[in-house]
């Protein structure tokens, strides 16, 4: 039975199934690799947004990471409690979030681990193949949800 759980799926399998399985396995590898830093894959994604932006509101973070505001609020509170994020009011209605010094150090350490996991996932691919995979995934991520084939026969 355990052999069936670890067997690779057929490349001809349903694309949605392959995406889901790949995502689950990759996320599990991230969670495992980040665990001793006190981060989950989701928390790493949140912190990584700050690599290119100094501070954001929770609503902006939620939009960027495609989660609900409520989910982001809970995540930000957890990261704040862990000493990785801090909040400061912009005005009476908006509170900005930014990484603490500890948060930036944790992000740097986590990013090294994530890159190692990525290298493992991409092992065996040529540079051209890796670039093709990354380009394809980026294009797929940008695909609108309204894209449908209307001439199905």
Where does each model-flagged region fall?
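Residues within helix-turn-helix
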Residues: 58-59, 70, 77, 95
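Short alpha-helical elements of helix-turn-helix
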Residues: 13-17, 37-48, 70
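Short capping segments at the starts of secondary-structure elements
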Residues: 53-57
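Charged, amphipathic alpha-helical coiled-coil/dimerization segments
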Residues: 27, 77-138, 142
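Pre-recognition alpha-helix immediately N-terminal to the DNA-recognition helix
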Residues: 18, 25, 29, 45-51, ...
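Residues within the alpha-helical elements of helix-turn-helix
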Residues: 64
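N-terminal leader segment of winged-helix/HTH proteins
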Residues: 1-37, 128, 151-153
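Basic amphipathic alpha-helical segments that dock to polyanions
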Residues: 47, 61, 78-82
């Amino acid at each position: 039975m355990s052999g069936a759980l670890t067997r690779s799926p057929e490349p001809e399998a349903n694309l949605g199934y392959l995406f889901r399985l790949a995502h689950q396995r990759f996320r599990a590898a991230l969670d495992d690799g980040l665990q001793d830093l006190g981060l989950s894959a989701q928390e790493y994604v949140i912190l990584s947004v700050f690599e290119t932006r100094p501070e954001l509101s929770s609503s902006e973070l939620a939009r960027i990471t495609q989660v609900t505001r409520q989910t982001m609020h809970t995540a930000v509170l957890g990261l704040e409690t862990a000493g990785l994020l801090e909040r400061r009011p912009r005005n009476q209605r908006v509170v900005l979030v930014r990484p603490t010094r500890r948060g930036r150090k944790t992000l740097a350490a986590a990013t090294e681990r994530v890159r190692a996991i990525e290298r493992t996932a991409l092992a065996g691919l040529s540079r051209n193949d890796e670039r093709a995979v990354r380009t394809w995934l980026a294009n797929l991520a940008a695909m609108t949800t309204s894209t449908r084939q209307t001439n199905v026969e």
